[in-house]
Amino acid sequence: MESLAAALGHPVDAKLLILSADQLGSTHAATAGGFAALREGVATTGTVMMPGPWSRDAADRHDGADLGIHLTLNSHLDCYRWGPLTAAPSLLDGDGGFPRTVDDLWDHADLDEVRRECRAQIERARLWGFDLTHLATHLGTLQQRPEFFDVLVDVAYDAELPVRLESGRAEERAGFPFRRLAAEEGILMPDHFTLVRGGARAHLDATLAALQPGVTVVAFEPAIAAEEIRAIDPDAAQRMDDLDVLTDRAVRDRIDTAGAVLIGFREIRDLQRARR
């Protein structure tokens, strides 16, 4: 079977690297930080949270950037909440927003309402002018349970978009072969995925040192230094560190030294659509 790298026109042993700035639209700091990473740094793609209060600002500023949808069914912060775009009572918690935890959502979410909400987030993004390149799922909500994953596959297929899925032992933890199931529907996904959770510089260096052939996604959550993000997010310092790493001029040299080639999701999306 042809590798994704070869299908994209690269040597079969090429090390292709996608650096993602996640969660644009969630806060002003994350939106500004994401665009800084894309325009001034080495980020090659990003994701937008359409239920986020700053998603409209992200739409006004995107200027054709390689951006996907961070399909959002949770509102994980204690003092800063968002909820569904649709009328979806089963997707609300007692505070009137999305549930804070994945387990809470799984316990009472109606799958028809989940499907409508995911479609609405994609439709709003397109209405606002985003040229969507892929889908991701916030907190893995749509990945780790088969009935929810069915929704993700359905909306990805209809939208003709690749999906960012976890790799490694994630399928073992989930208990079902979600990567194979997506591939059977013609949905493309990168070969490897890692999410930075603190220590961004060391994490990226370790990833580059162990980089395998194929397409690898490293996801960051950059944010500018602002009182807003410090007040609402206990991980604010890590987000600011993510931005520092993504805009560090020396990082590009380290990427070159590792023999990696930077790409985005647009190439993968176009390949998937060409195969339909």
Regions found by a protein language model. Name each.
Residues 16-27, 103-115:
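Active-site mouth loops of central-metabolism enzymes
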Residues 22-24, 49-53, 70-74, 138-140, ...:
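Active-site beta-loop-alpha junctions enriched in small/polar residues
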Residues 163-164, 232-276:
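C-terminal domain-boundary segment and adjacent tail
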Residues 119-188, 194-201, 209:
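Catalytic domains of cell-wall/extracellular-matrix polysaccharide-remodeling enzymes
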Residues 5-76:
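Active-site beta->alpha N-cap acidic-glycine motif
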Residues 9, 34-40, 56-68, 81-93, ...:
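Acidic (Asp/Glu)-rich catalytic clusters
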Residues 78-106, 234-237:
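Active-site gating loops and adjacent loop-to-helix segments of metal-dependent hydrolytic enzymes
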Residues 16-18, 43-47, 64-70, 132-136, ...:
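Structural preference for beta-strand elements that scaffold enzyme active sites
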